[in-house]
Amino acid sequence: MRPRVPRLQPLSEAERAEISAAPRTSTAHRALLARLPAMNAVECGGQAGLAHLHRDFTVLAWNLERCLFPLDSAAHVAPKGPQVLLLSEMDHGMARTKQRHTTEDMARALGMAYAFGVEFFEMGLGGATERSFCEDDDNRLGWHGNAILSAVPFEDATMFRLDDHGHWFTPDAGGDAGQPRIGGRNAIAAILPGADGPICFVSTHLESNARADHRATQFDRLMDGVDRFAPDMPVIIGGDLNTGNSAPPGDDWRDEPLFDRAGARGYDWSLTPAGVTTRPSLITPHPARRMKLDWLCARGLTCLRNALLPSLDATGTPLSDHDAVLATLRG
């Protein structure tokens, strides 16, 4: 279990210097990751407006691509009435998003509680297109992670780390050498009060710079974590699973083994609507990139309907390079 805190502890200048000077090895990365408090806790805040979920409720999963526009993004989803949002790629104290706590900003705008956990402490300002959004020369906190927003209070919340070897820290692991980071992929899990009892919700983001077997192992760890954290409880998992990314020629999302592994453990993938979920954006202006990366699955719940929410605002501006996936379920 990871502790729940009202505020994550910023890295000190000494800790930042230690990270910069550390050898780029998995051993060094694991040692750093283990002793940084911010990487091993879940920040919980905001204010919920309901006592429990409706019997029929809507959940939305969205990779917000750093969340350049937290208030616009909140306004974009509000008409759909989701009671739970499963968010990934949320910045906190990053120059490219004006040092904002994007999760807290969205939660406040929607009148929701939130749980946020750090995937990565980013040692730089990001890629070339991201740096064009930076007004400062450094990151105040340097955090990037996943979150859950909820219209009801959290009964409990935790984080599962899905790897610790330093995929974006060690030069031979496969991450982008131009974006060095401490941390790794994670999942934020929360127990929320449903109409007929507690329900477990999970927001996750699997590895992009890896093959399908790597992601399948990460999803196995996630499911194992859920079984320990919320045994015998209905579960909803949502997020950017990066299905089909870094695949060999001829393969795509259909060849990912995580689908069958989850199905064998009782998870239903029919919550996810048909269609690709990526689009060109301000950070990722690649019109040819059309992929199905974003998913919802559940165990012990009935899906009533689902939909894709395009990430274009009223002016046609892309809020993200991912569209959101929604499902209405009966608890």
Give the residues covered by each predicted segment.
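Residues that flank catalytic or metal-binding motifs in active/ligand-binding sites
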Residues: 55, 102, 142-145, 184-188, ...
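Active site of divalent-metal-dependent phosphoester/diester hydrolases
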Residues: 4, 113-148, 243-319
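Eukaryote-specific, low-hydrophobicity, charge-rich regions
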Residues: 30-61, 74-84, 113
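Active-site beta-strand/loop signature of hydrolases that rely on acidic residues for catalysis
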Residues: 58-64, 73-99, 115-119, 149, ...
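Short helix-loop capping/hinge motifs at secondary-structure junctions, enriched
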Residues: 153-158, 199, 302-305
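Acidic-and-aromatic substrate-binding clefts and catalytic sites of carbohydrate-active enzymes
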Residues: 63-71, 92-97, 180, 210-213, ...
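Structured beta-strand-rich core segments of catalytic domains in phosphoester-bond hydrolases
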Residues: 3-11, 19-45, 91-195
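Short catalytic/ligand-binding loop motif for oxyanion handling, primarily in non-cytosolic enzymes
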Residues: 69-70, 93-96, 123-127, 157, ...
